[in-house]
């Protein structure tokens, strides 16, 4: 069994920069993890559900880390996120900016968040650098009574990630934000480790430090 699994869902393929980051992790972390690529489906909700269901049903590792195809990170970033999971944070991620560097890709509970290197509870966490364990998935299935869809087909999955909307806030919720909603419904909190600040490749590479130290929620 490996310590954790890295999963990349990328219909357009993985950037060379992200591939280089993964190779560096292989060199420094050796055989502590496996990488799984899901690249032949443009329906991001479905592919994330398939990948997460595969992880839940497998025995190759206790923790899973989603990384987007255009995120830049170090072995230290991966190791810190893995340690957070080992320390009992069932759903936690690192910080990264949106592609234009305008703000950090998460939504806070308070109006502002200080990027001070501590772990903080947030409302919504994006999947670009997100980790979780099998317990939270099992509890989602049991407590939310999630059905197994497309059983025994190539796309068999539980609907952990679904694009929907919030009636109370009157906003659209992306599949990763809905995952956070489901986690809270199952009795869990959502966290971000502000000591983990990874890059996001757009027209240039942006890091959270390129955004304001304090920023308004989007």
What are these regions (language model features)?
Residues 1-42, 46:
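N-proximal low-complexity "stem/linker" segments adjacent to membrane-targeting elements
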Residues 8-9, 25, 41, 70, ...:
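Polar low-complexity intrinsically disordered regions
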Residues 30, 86, 184:
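Anion (oxyanion) recognition and catalysis
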Residues 49-63:
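Active-site nucleotide-sugar/metal-binding loop of Leloir-type enzymes
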Residues 52, 74-164:
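Conserved catalytic core of nucleotide-sugar-dependent glycosyltransferases
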Residues 60-72:
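Short beta-strand-to-loop acidic/aromatic patch adjacent to the donor-nucleotide binding site
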Residues 63, 89-91, 190:
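Short, Asp-centered acidic motifs that coordinate Mg2+ and/or phosphate
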Residues 144-218:
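C-terminal catalytic/acceptor-binding lobe
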